[in-house]
Amino acid sequence: MTCTSAFIKVVRFIQVVIDTREIRSLCTIRMQVESLQNLQAKIRNDERNHSLTKKYLTDDIVKKYQATKTSLGGTLAQCVNTNAYNPGALLPRSCDLNAYETFRDFFDAVIADYHKVPDGKIQHPKSNFGDLKSLSFTDLNTYGNLVVSTRVRLGRTVEGFGFGPTLTKETRIELENKISTALHNLSGEYEGTYYPLTGMSEEDRIKLVNDHFLFRNDDNVLRDAGGYIDWPTGRGIFINKQKNFLVWINEEDHIRVISMQKGGDLIAVYKRLADAIQELSKSLKFAFNDRLGFITFCPSNLGTTLRASVHAKIPMLASLPNFKEICEKHGIQPRGTHGEHTESVGGIYDLSNKRRLGLTELDAVTEMHSGVRALLELEVMLQEYNKGAPEGVMPVEPLTYLAKLLEGASIEKCYTRKYLTPEIIKKYDGKRTTHGATLAHMIRNGAYNNRSICPRTGEAECYSTFIDYLDPLICDYHGVKDSAFKHPAPTFGDLSKLPFGDLDPTGKFIVSTRVRVGRSVEDFLFPTIMSKTDRIKLEQVISGALKGLTGEHAGTYYPLTDMKEEDRKQLVEDHFLFKNDDPVLRDAGGYRDWPVGRGIFHNNSKTFLVWVCEEDHMRIISMQQGGNLAAVYKRLIEGINAIGKSMKFAHSDKYGYITCCPSNLGTSMRASVLLKIPKLSSQPKKLDEICAKYMLQARGLYGEHTESPDGTYDISNKRRLGLTELQAAHEMAEGVAKMIEIEKGL
């Protein structure tokens, strides 16, 4: 006896009429999941998980909703289950159409964040596809013939039915029948055939696969959200005769209505979709909410649910390190060739509008057209500007294009912009070094990060090829007054008779001391433009030398590629692991091929550390707790000398040691202490005066561009060029001693 028939007998017995929707609710065999508390713990404890679910699934939310159910029996645990098992999944999924209101405090926070809702006030206008007779979009293949196909789709939920976690097999079939009947009634260009997945013939299956129409059950995120329960029952595909109109039934949403065709004629595709959905609305009632718009399984699709997209050939644009950020700037979301969570094939990407909530359908498709047009125009520029570039070198936007973006930077604070004059642009536009580095490569990080101070070079040759740009910049940054400057020869001093010792014998002010230098290996390009092959070769050269160190410097090398989880956790705990999260270095090309060719070496006592292929080929670091600068400095110099026996460092009589960033030229040394100066730091003007007088640089506790609320600052020497290593360390020591003296007196 079925659940429904048993219930109806009870109904007849007590002579009560119950709505069929209530029967569905009471008889649902729901997706079984762990408790909300357990799922929250899994999400919270997974450091790979950076989802909005993790952000907003607070203890208060769990407490409030742990026993709450929707009218269809759905739970918040069902909504967040997929995030517990897929750390890369950004969003929860709604268990049914009522979940957004039942769990409103949770979902509203997620929705407002994802859709960038101003002031968190969620609202959505009435549906408006515009006047379909007067659309004015240009064909997107006008811009370089790069568009392979155009596609516009939207999702719809039929009122009265749950989503995957709360649908029974019987109601899923009922829903399928309801939708397929409406589709069979379509006429004209929409007339077609419905193919249920259950019992599908092999001939039909092969045909649908060949046409790329068949959806599958291989998405882990959708699976763990309950999207594949009872697969393939209740699911199917409708296709019109021209194969340019398609409807998926019970894939993620109840229906996905899709209009598509080859080429870039967005008007034809959009009009076909709009006419069809208006026709289907006559026989199907779609769930709509005045705040959220049309209701969908995933919060990302709320609102219009409309996703207008093209498959476009953009290999150069897609290879840029900040490709996703460029797309986001233009309101576009990039995906792989075969959809979300897939890779691109042959440089072809799916580009679609990102915004769906808070605007009309016409607004959404207009934004998509404008954004895609801008990206296609940029791809055309990239292809033209990078003709003849050496293989493996990162493509780069035209110098004039980046110079325009750089205008947003402060001409007083940004050296990159200050010296990029019209004359310099004219002189160096299109010029390359022997291995393909351009001035455009160098200024790119500043163009996209206007707070960045200095350019990044691609190889040592940049300093001679672009000398008229770099030399004035270098003189200004390093305070060098003579344009014919020459850096002194390396001088580390007598390590047994150093002019400084422990800067804080009492231990009251200095938390730790650290001295580092950058080194480039001769005949290798810098990490910003280096090829993957050379990156691996360089890592082998450096790691081989490090593994040969002895005595106090002997230790272990940890390559970032295929790093063991236990090693990764230990390096994180020790604060040794460098990451790929600096947008300035990213946009200079510093994270290309990540994590290939990179690694970390540290000695057994964890006081000597080498970063391989972060910004420079090597960052060699000596450090320890307390203020004993002499011990830290001595360890560093002895380590540098030992490594230098196995390779030749890039060095110039003019610039000293050659580094990726001009700020590190010369000694490339940064000697620093973590200094507790709460009284002095509460007087920013006085702190700045001391730093200026003693040529020091003060950074926040977490590095450059950060604050220090507790008064602990990273204090380091500012000068690196025009003085010896010994002088640089001594300069820092004298300045720190003065700061401690002032702090004591306040």
UniProtKB/Swiss-Prot annotation:
Assigned protein family? Belongs to the ATP:guanido phosphotransferase family.
Ranges for the Phosphagen kinase N-terminal domain? 35-116, 398-479
UniProtKB keywords: ATP-binding, Flavoprotein, Kinase, Magnesium, Metal-binding, Nucleotide-binding, Oxidoreductase, Repeat, Transferase
| Molecular-function annotations in GO | ATP binding; creatine kinase activity; metal ion binding; oxidoreductase activity; taurocyamine kinase activity
Name the cystine pairs. Answer: none
EC class of the enzyme, as a word: transferase
Q: Where does ATP bind?
A: 149-153, 212, 256, 307-311, 335-340, 512-516, 575, 619, 670-674, 699-704
> What reaction(s) does this enzyme catalyze?
taurocyamine + ATP = N-phosphotaurocyamine + ADP + H(+)
Q: What is its EC number?
A: 2.7.3.4
What does UniProt list as this organism's lineage?
Eukaryota, Metazoa, Spiralia, Lophotrochozoa, Platyhelminthes
Active-site residues (renumbered): C298, C661
One GO location term (cellular component): extracellular space
Instruction: Please indicate which superkingdom the organism of origin belongs to.
Output: Eukaryota
Instruction: Relate the protein's function as given in its record.
Output: This family of enzymes reversibly catalyzes the transfer of phosphate between ATP and various phosphogens (e.g. creatine phosphate).
* CDD domains recorded: arginine_kinase_like
Query: Tell me, what is an example of a GO biological process annotation in this record?
Result: phosphocreatine biosynthetic process
Against InterPro entries, the record matches this protein to: ATP-guanido_PTrfase, ATP-guanido_PTrfase_AS, ATP-guanido_PTrfase_cat, ATP-guanido_PTrfase_N, ATP-guanido_PTrfase_N_sf, Gln_synth/guanido_kin_cat_dom
Approximate repeat residue numbers: 31-393, 394-705
Whether Secreted counts among this entry's keywords is: no
Q: Locate the Phosphagen kinase C-terminal domain: which residues?
A: 146-382, 509-746
Q: Which cofactor does it need?
A: Mg(2+)
The protein depicted here goes by the name Taurocyamine kinase
